[in-house]
């Protein structure tokens, strides 16, 4: 194992045409690349192969965050155009946002959205602005009336009605994410029925995915990278389900990198404890896993923290080999793309 990992170690060549621009007609119609760590093998399957790998007493953990229509368009009092991406809702009328304009807004200045919603800039923290909505309505009211789904930057088109349903898991409950927990997008009701018939348990954590998930790693050395913060919650019910799973010799299966980060944040010395708050956990090769036994995930961007996490769990050489095979076999990549299972 290397002592000094470089961001460039996680680069790979991806033809642009393999980046999925739209979802498949069937949520569960994706392909599945399966990595067996013990045998060091990589095999090609369909997504229903995920359920085939689940055993009785396994615990499948998903992220129930809900994507909000977080992208707003408005103008300054001077008339200049403004684009606002809500990063985190702090209260009914207060939120943090990324703001794009010809000139950065000054503290105390106003942004007008659709004439009847007024936003005041009250603070700035690095790239984020603290904003207050001056209205009897809530920030969620504003977003659901005038916001747009914030599709990832590698999807080169405007969002449409199809995205409102498909860039959202069918089990999304808690509003607050600006990006979908994409491993969960493959699940339909038939998937859940099949898991229950296998004798698996199902539970949910929450991590509100922020725009930081798309930010590039700017440091050359991973040791110098500072991870973005995201809000998460692991409840006592989840901890109890994990304890029961362990007692029955089952495996904890994380559906997505967000679930992985939740569970590993909440687990210390092999014990998962309830936790609600911030996480900036950065998982890369050399990390000691304490909770998760198997990971279902999508394919991730070159040099991204998500790919680094997957390499930490699956083994660097094996995962990078699998990515090369995925490219050669023309898998669909990123949010609307195919899946990978590592066990």
From Swiss-Prot:
Location of this chain's protein in the cell: Cytoplasm
UniProt keywords, alphabetically: Cytoplasm, Queuosine biosynthesis, S-adenosyl-L-methionine, Transferase
Pathway: tRNA modification; tRNA-queuosine biosynthesis
GO biological process: queuosine biosynthetic process; tRNA wobble guanine modification
Keyword Transferase in annotation: yes
PANTHER family noted in UniProt: S-ADENOSYLMETHIONINE:TRNA RIBOSYLTRANSFERASE-ISOMERASE (PTHR30307:SF0)
Subunit structure: Monomer.
Protein name (Swiss-Prot/TrEMBL): S-adenosylmethionine:tRNA ribosyltransferase-isomerase
Organism: Coxiella burnetii (strain RSA 493 / Nine Mile phase I)
Lineage: Bacteria, Pseudomonadati, Pseudomonadota, Gammaproteobacteria, Legionellales
């Amino acid at each position: 194992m290397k002592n000094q990992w470089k961001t460039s170690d996680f680069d790979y060549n991806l033809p642009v045409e393999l980046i999925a621009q739209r979802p498949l007609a069937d949520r569960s119609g994706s392909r599945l690349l399966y990595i067996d760590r013990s045998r060091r093998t990589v095999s090609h399957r369909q997504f229903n192969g995920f359920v085939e790998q689940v055993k009785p007493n396994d615990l499948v953990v998903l992220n129930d965050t809900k994507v909000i229509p977080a992208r707003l368009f408005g103008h300054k009092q001077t008339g200049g155009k403004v684009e606002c991406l809500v990063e985190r809702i702090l209260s009914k009328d207060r939120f943090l946002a990324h703001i794009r304009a010809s000139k950065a807004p000054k503290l105390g200045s106003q942004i007008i959205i659709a004439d009847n919603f007024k936003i005041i800039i009250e603070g700035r923290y690095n790239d984020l602005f603290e904003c207050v909505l001056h209205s009897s309505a809530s920030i969620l009211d504003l977003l659901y009336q005038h916001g747009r789904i914030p599709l990832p930057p590698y999807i080169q088109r405007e969002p449409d009605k199809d995205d409102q349903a498909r860039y959202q898991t069918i089990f999304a409950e808690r509003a607050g994410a600006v990006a979908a927990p994409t491993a969960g997008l493959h699940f339909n009701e038939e998937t859940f029925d099949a898991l229950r018939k296998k004798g698996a348990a199902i539970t949910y954590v929450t991590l509100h995915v922020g725009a930081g998930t798309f930010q590039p790693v700017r440091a050359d050395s991973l040791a110098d990278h500072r991870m973005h913060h995201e809000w998460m919650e692991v409840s006592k019910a989840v901890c109890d389900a994990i304890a029961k799973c362990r007692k029955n010799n089952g495996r904890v299966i994380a559906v997505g990198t967000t679930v992985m980060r939740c569970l590993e944040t909440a687990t210390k010395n092999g014990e998962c404890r309830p936790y609600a708050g911030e996480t900036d956990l950065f998982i890369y090769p050399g990390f000691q896993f304490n909770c998760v036994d198997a990971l279902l995930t999508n394919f991730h961007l070159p040099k991204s923290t998500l790919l680094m996490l997957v390499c930490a769990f699956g083994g660097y050489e094996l995962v990078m080999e699998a990515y090369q095979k995925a490219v050669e076999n023309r898998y669909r990549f990123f949010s609307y793309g195919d899946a990978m299972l590592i066990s």
